[in-house]
């Protein structure tokens, strides 16, 4: 979708000072502002409050109009803390939605929801800006090619492959490894594909945001010597921000990604961590605006808000945005309205399992719950499809036999079932993999495994060629050759102990 970027320097100096309102009421992050008759701002217009607090410190708060109340009043949601604001303060209507800087100048930098740099590296060239509220590309502009996006992570590439220009969800409860998986994907994609990424930190921990920034500087994804050579732009609206900022920070990140797609005609990666916090912030704002809550206390506009964000993430004939979104699952309940609404938009789902994490199998991706629309013979080829189906069948049979094993033990199984269980346990361990970004914690060097190597490895396990190897040889290795080498080392160690 082509849109001419606006070329103007942002700031209040260029604002029409005539359209002034006054704060009539402040309730937390929500402001009611009275304007002169006939001078009402439009929905989504940015309002700016400038002044000084009671101690004389300067205040500069940007708000977004959400409701027109009548009696020449509007209700707006603040994008930053409202501390120090008082009734009667002047409010300037900017006459336009929030606009953020876009283009090459954003690479290697960290921004807040307003597009202001927060990394203490000086101002950003904001001669080119885009409004954060934009319509999705027209149907005729969409690109419908189907191709696989290789990640180098075995369990993902084999069982739930990602679509280039598609939307992928990482589902998991607290502490099962969503953010680590996202960091690994950024690392692998920057190294293997050299693509540009935009990372939207929506309502997550500030510490994780800082860790990610440091990690990117160490791995060279952000080039400290020459910032312009960096491969990623970061947009943060963390847990401590007001709900307005957390609700809009995803749109800011998406707007920056859209510029790379539409104007630079690039393939972009958009990471959102965490899309649930976008819904949560929308729920808080909805309650503050006095809307009647719907199921489980969520906002009545949940599907609309999610749709307006997700429909902008797509491939056009100019370029593509491949989006990988972490989805926190409240109380591990996938039927909760927030994850359930997200499911409808996704091409692939990577479900993280607490059971696998407890066994120490990382990435803790559930091979049976994770799905992908790309796993079809006409897209991935017969060999890949057959291998993936056999792996799933073996693991499913193992899952069915677990109750019998728990009650009666392995000895009561038939010879065929015992062989299935042995192979399934090897497959389960071979689906684990050492990550580059976790090297500092695990001490094992990270591994990138190509798709052909992955398929070959699982075919060897399924064929029975490796039935004689111990299952621990398959744990936390890269390709199958490393597993056989590890088995030889284990055998030598056990012989030397004897």
Swiss-Prot record:
Membrane topology value: Peripheral membrane protein
GO molecular function: ATP binding; ATP hydrolysis activity; proton-transporting ATP synthase activity, rotational mechanism
Annotated Pfam families: ATP-synt_ab, ATP-synt_ab_N, ATP-synt_VA_C
Positions bound to ATP: 172-179
Keywords, sorted A to Z: ATP synthesis, ATP-binding, CF(1), Chloroplast, Hydrogen ion transport, Ion transport, Membrane, Nucleotide-binding, Plastid, Thylakoid, Translocase, Transport
Record's catalysed reaction(s): ATP + H2O + 4 H(+)(in) = ADP + phosphate + 5 H(+)(out)
The protein's enzyme class: translocase
SMART domains assigned: AAA (SM00382)
Record's subunit section: F-type ATPases have 2 components, CF(1) - the catalytic core - and CF(0) - the membrane proton channel. CF(1) has five subunits: alpha(3), beta(3), gamma(1), delta(1), epsilon(1). CF(0) has four main subunits: a(1), b(1), b'(1) and c(9-12).
Subcellular location: Plastid, Chloroplast thylakoid membrane
GO cellular component: chloroplast thylakoid membrane; proton-transporting ATP synthase complex
InterPro entries listed in its UniProt record: AAA+_ATPase (IPR003593), ATP-synt_VA_C (IPR055190), ATP_synth_F1_bsu (IPR005722), ATPase_a/bsu_AS (IPR020003), ATPase_alpha/beta_chains (IPR050053), ATPase_F1/V1/A1_a/bsu_N (IPR004100), ATPase_F1/V1/A1_a/bsu_N_sf (IPR036121), ATPase_F1/V1/A1_a/bsu_nucl-bd (IPR000194)
Keyword Chloroplast in record: yes
Entry-linked SUPFAM superfamilies: C-terminal domain of alpha and beta subunits of F1 ATP synthase, N-terminal domain of alpha and beta subunits of F1 ATP synthase, P-loop containing nucleoside triphosphate hydrolases
Listed EC numbers: 7.1.2.2
Function: Produces ATP from ADP in the presence of a proton gradient across the membrane. The catalytic sites are hosted primarily by the beta subunits.
Protein name as it appears in the record: ATP synthase subunit beta, chloroplastic
Main subcellular location: plastid
Record family assignment: Belongs to the ATPase alpha/beta chains family.
